[in-house]
Amino acid sequence: MAEKRDYYEVLEVTKTATVEEIKKAYRKKAIQYHPDKNPGDKEAEEKFKEAAEAYDVLSNPDKRSRYDQFGHAGVSGAAGNGGPFGGFGGEGMSMDDIFSMFGDIFGGRGGGFSGGFGGFSGFGGGGGGSQQRRYRGSDLRVKVKMTLKEISTGVEKKFKLKKYVPCNHCHGTGAEGDGGSETCPTCKGSGSVIRNQQTILGTMQTRTTCPTCNGEGKIIKNKCKECGGDGIVYGEEVVTVKIPAGVAEGMQLSMGGKGNAGKHNGVPGDLLILVEEEPHPDLIRDENDLIYNLLLSFPTAALGGAVEIPTIDGKVKVKIDSGTQPGKVLRLRGKGLPNVNGYGTGDLLVNISIYVPEALNKEEKSTLEKMEASDNFKPSTSVKEKIFKKFKSFFD
């Protein structure tokens, strides 16, 4: 499967582009690769879909924020459906779905340019063709709790969703039987009507949604007895979600087409998965790094030795050098979490503290008193300076 291109690159805009600039760039791409302008050209069709996918994400503030933070995984591929439109293929969005969803850009598939592009249409009012409305189902939201271990490897989670699904009795049409619906007599099935208006500049044509069928192009004569004419019923579905490694608390993934079904075989909504991170008993997360606070006994810090450190994959032995000072940080490279976009892995940082006992017996006290008298146990000027600098850094 080809790697997805950066959405900003697809539309040829900067990451600071405004919504209007993004809309203008998308319109330019859509005109360039429009199927009416490039009949039978599969490559142009794919680029047309790619531009629509990029526009869907970058024109939506929430999706754009997730994309800027997490890349494609934040809005699409993590859910295993290839994109916010399910990859624009298979069970994903069709060309008609794109025209339906971006009607404010296209003005309907049939309207638009009457010259310059031959049969090219799709951007404006006028012209003939179909502009049938497809209802979009609402999005569903679920929360998923993940351990650091699951985050480190990625995981599949199953959800049993209570949602609206297409009615089996009428196959989503909302009509009872084959003759339950008929073509709208007002718009002749196009879903829109053209109105002529006289102005000082002459006759102006405007296209509006058909008031008789509300843009559907059909009228239901006999409503389905199971769904009442909506084409959807309340049911359930088990969905398997592939969550990538490296996700973080608060990240929202999108699984295209797995939300509520749309009325009358409309476009289904999306399933939005909010990640919640379960706390680890020993490790603290700092972006892709993990932190462990190690409390050493004074003898081990002074004499050196080996201690066990917990990691995501189990415990590992770490060498402690003699004379280890409090505040020292050991770095275990590659023992952190992977980047959600696949760029490298964090480290495990071991912060060392020295344990000082609160109570001593006579023998311990006597031993420490003898040690205190030795010049070797008195901090040197360099050690004092290091401690002062470290203390001062907390306030800088």
UniProtKB/Swiss-Prot annotation:
Oligomer status and interactors: Homodimer.
Xref: Pfam families: DnaJ, DnaJ_C, DnaJ_CXXCXGXG
Cofactor: Zn(2+)
Upper classification of the organism: Bacteria, Pseudomonadati, Bacteroidota, Bacteroidia, Bacteroidales
CXXCXGXG motif repeats: 167-174, 184-191, 210-217, 224-231
Name of the protein: Chaperone protein DnaJ
Organism: Bacteroides thetaiotaomicron (strain ATCC 29148 / DSM 2079 / JCM 5827 / CCUG 10774 / NCTC 10582 / VPI-5482 / E50)
Keywords from the named record: Chaperone, Cytoplasm, DNA replication, Metal-binding, Repeat, Stress response, Zinc, Zinc-finger
Domain comment quoted from the record: The J domain is necessary and sufficient to stimulate DnaK ATPase activity. Zinc center 1 plays an important role in the autonomous, DnaK-independent chaperone activity of DnaJ. Zinc center 2 is essential for interaction with DnaK and for DnaJ activity.
Function text: Participates actively in the response to hyperosmotic and heat shock by preventing the aggregation of stress-denatured proteins and by disaggregating proteins, also in an autonomous, DnaK-independent fashion. Unfolded proteins bind initially to DnaJ; upon interaction with the DnaJ-bound protein, DnaK hydrolyzes its bound ATP, resulting in the formation of a stable complex. GrpE releases ADP from DnaK; ATP binding to DnaK triggers the release of the substrate protein, thus completing the reaction cycle.
